[in-house]
Amino acid sequence: MDHLSNLPDELLCHIMSFLTTKEAALISVLSKRWRNLIAFVPNLDIFDCDILHWEVRKEERDDIRQLFMDFVDRVLALQGNSPLKKFSLCCGGGSYSDRVDCWIQNVMVRGVSELDLSMIFDTSYHMYPQVFENKKLNFEIFLRALPALEELVMNHIYWKELDVNVHVSVSSASLKTLTIKCIVCLHTKSFDTPSLAYLSYSDYAMGDYPVAKMENLFEARISLFVPEDDISRLMNSIRNVRYLYFSRDTLEVLSLCCESMPVFKNLKSLSIKSVESRGWQAMPVLLRNCPHLETLVLEALLHHVTDKCGDACACVSREEKGRSLKSCPVKVLEIKEFQGTMKEMHMIKHFLDYLPCLKEMKISYMKKNDHTTQFRVIPQVIAEMVEHYNKLSNCNVQLVVSG
C-alpha cells in the first residue's frame, strides 16, 4: 500500500476507474487521501446485486434497497460537480424509479459521455428526457459523420423547435435509399442526395424545397398531404425516375403545379392511387409529360369529377376528350380495385378508344360478400362487356377475379 500511496493522484484515479464503485468505496476507507480521490474517478459502475442478495427475506431486502440508494446518493454527493465520462447502473425493483431519475439528472448535468443503464421496474418508467438530447449535435452534422451511409429511415420525427420555421437538409453523397414518414414541425426541406436510387416520401407538403438534387433516382413513392404548397421544385428533382407511385392526396397536390410539371423522360411505370373524394386535375398534363411511359397502374378509377380532368377520362363530355391520351405511349394498363360500376366500364371503354399503343389491359375485381350466398356472382353484363372489348379492340383485356 505504501508503494501505491507514492503514486500521483491522476494515476491513482486511473487505477480506481477499473474498479466497480463498490470496490473503490471500500478502498477509500483506507485513508483520507483515498476517500478524497473517489470524488475524481471518471467512471462509475454501480450494481445493486453487489449489495442486495435475493435469498434474504423481503423485509431485509427492503432495508438493503434503502442502503443501496443511500450508497449511490453518498457517492454522487462526494463527487460533487467533477466531470464524469461513464455511468453504468444496473438495478431492479419498482422502489428505485424516483431516485433513478435524480441520479441520471446528476450525471447528465456533469456532462457524462457514456450512459449504460440496465433497469427492471414493476411499473412503467419514463426516463429523464434529456438523456435523448444532444445540444452540440444537429442533423446535418450527424449525416456528415456518416460518409458511407446508404440507407436512412426517418419515421415520425417531432422537431423540438415548435415555435420557429425549421429547415432540415438531407445531404449525403453516399445515400441510396431514403424513407421519410411524418416529420412534424418543418417549414422547408432540402434533398442533396445525388446517389439516391429509392425514395419513399410520405409527409405534409413543405412550403419550399430550396435544394432538391436526386438526378439518379430509380424508384419513388410519393404521398403528400395538404394541397396548399407548390411542389414543382421537388417534382423537378425526381424527373429522371423510372418507377413512380403517387398517392391519392399527392395527385391533388400536383394540381397546383400543372404549369410547371417537368417531363419525366425516363419514366417507364407510373402508379396512381385514386379515391372518389380526390380529383384528377393533374392527370392530363402528367400523362402528356411521360413520353416513354410503358405501364400505367390505376389503383381504382372512381374520382371526384372536375372540369379539368375531362380530357383524361370519360367524366365530362367535350370535343377534346381523350386529347392527353392520344400522345400517351402506354402499352400495359392495370386497373385495380375495380368495383363493376357502369361509370368504371365507360372509363375502360374510354381508355381502349384513346390509348393508341395499348396492348394489354388487366382488370382486378374483388368478390364481395352477399347476404344470400357466400360470394356474389360477377354480374353477367361485366363479363359480356369485357368479351365485347376483346373483339372490338386489338388490346388483350383480362378480368382477374379474386376473393
From Swiss-Prot:
The keyword Repeat applies. SMART domains: FBD, FBOX. It holds the Pfam family F-box. LRR repeats lie at residues 64-91, 93-119, 131-156, 175-203, 243-274, 275-300. Keywords: Leucine-rich repeat, Repeat. Residues 1-47 form the F-box domain. The keyword DNA-binding does not apply. InterPro entries: F-box-like_dom_sf (IPR036047), F-box_AtFBL13-like (IPR053781), F-box_dom (IPR001810), FBD (IPR006566), FBL60-like (IPR055294), LRR_dom_sf (IPR032675). Disulfide bonds: none annotated. PANTHER family: F-BOX_RNI SUPERFAMILY PROTEIN, RNI-LIKE SUPERFAMILY PROTEIN. This is Putative F-box/LRR-repeat protein At5g38386. It comes from Arabidopsis thaliana. The lineage of its organism: Eukaryota, Viridiplantae, Streptophyta, Embryophyta, Tracheophyta.
